[in-house]
């Protein structure tokens, strides 16, 4: 069974382990249904990746402690620690982390190299599609500071 979600924000998915796949379509607009069908029947690659982390439960998130707040006032006290930054800093694994996604093909990542003087960095990697189908993937790099004068995320 494949579940297709069409929603405007992250939702809890405690049942996700009991289905074959979850396709998060977000708000696809008037052309969204055609794209969803193309992915489901294999005519298009599900190349998108999550742009946010999805927690196991909303109570894991720091913003939940400040909800609902006073009438007409929302408290945003989590600072920079939202999404993957919170999960990293708190050591709380996400159900589906930032960047999660599947593909109809496979990729090999080789020749990873990071060079620089500590101020300017150059990151390079060779990515090869080693599967039988066309597909796309993406490279994500993050960095950390060891000398922050404020409470800073582990990675950013």
Features from the language model and the residues they span:
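Intrinsically disordered, low-complexity segments enriched in Ser/Pro/Gly/Ala and basic residues
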Residues: 5, 123, 151-155
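Hydrophobic anchor at the start of a short beta-strand
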Residues: 1-2
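Short aromatic-acidic-glycine turn motif
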Residues: 62, 143-156
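Secreted, periplasmic, or luminal enzymes acting at the cell surface/secretory milieu
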Residues: 6-136, 142-144
